Amino acid sequence: EFAAQGDPSAESSRAVAAARIFAAAVSARLSEFAERVAEKASLAPDDESLATTAGYLAASKATWQLCSLIFVEPGDGTGIVSEGLEEWFKENASALNLGENGLPERLRALLSEIATISEENGMGNQSGNDTTAPHMNPEDASQYWSCFTSLVALGWTDAAIDLVGLHSCWDEWRMGKERAKPHAELLEAVVALLRCTPRLKLIDESELAEEEQHGDGLGDADEDLSDIFGGLNTHRRRRDGDETSNKFTATSAPQFSAFREAWVRQVQRVIDDNALFDTCGDSELAQGCRAALQTMVGEETAIKRAVGANSNWLELFIASARNKFVSLRVAGDCAALLRKCIASQGKSHHSPELDELIISILEADASAVASAVSKHLDAWFLANVAEML
């Protein structure tokens, strides 16, 4: 039906627009249903059946979105999926059953420990009795710096910046303590570089207009879909709703490469600034910042250390795509990187079924995807993914 409208020569672009709209519609439906069931499960923590259903739906949503990223015009036509993989992982990490060594669980444990430190400090200040107990700061939590470097490696930039924002040096600097100045200056340098990490967002205006035109026509038939077809889930709405989308953003692959090279040079200059590190009296802070910076420029050993020796292969894959293989293509080195990360970390013992699904998708093997879906997901999902593939 799409191909029959207008110029027949535009059949391919219309088919792609239709595929994007279809994928977005199913994704939105899955997201809505998953969120509704997850909310019910949170209100009934003893209901194991409801918790299982919530986990299944979250995994289904993650699987669908990854299929869409790989099979529906990867990289919005560029073929480059590094940034898309990063965003997909950020949104779905908690549904991927990464285990206690995965970043979601490690971050949850860290925040709990920081909350305990804050509570104990508050109780000590109120009592005013125990002057011998050591005062602890957020950065004294056991996984503070390891979580920070993991957040940087996996592209959870806002969370990484929020975490270093808890460091005690900021308050000390504001109070005029000179010893805190070199600590804050080093952290400031890292945060500034994180904020200006280059991005690639290549979406043609004519494609946006066409998607919205077709989408509006489809959306009128069902009021509930008005935010999907031509609405909240269009490329334009997602792009324009992102406050940082036009900052340090390349609009072509060559421009992104140039932006990235210039940015890496800036990061390397900070790494090579020995005075900046030598004046920092906190060795853990200096080591944490250096590890983060080395990860940002794509040093392979730094990336592996940042995600952790016991991390899931998927975390190493995403971190490598973000920091080293920044122009990763489905038709290029994606499968090779996948195999390398699995060889390094091993397959997941927590969810072999989800592993099979994700691996088949990242290998862009449509028949393997269909086979895995038929084994591990329901008939509704299989019917819809068959339409996409």
Per-range role (PLM):
Residues 145, 272-389:
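Extended alpha-helical solenoid scaffold regions that build the rod-like backbones
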Residues 1-133, 141-153, 158-310, 314:
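Compositionally biased, long intrinsically disordered regions
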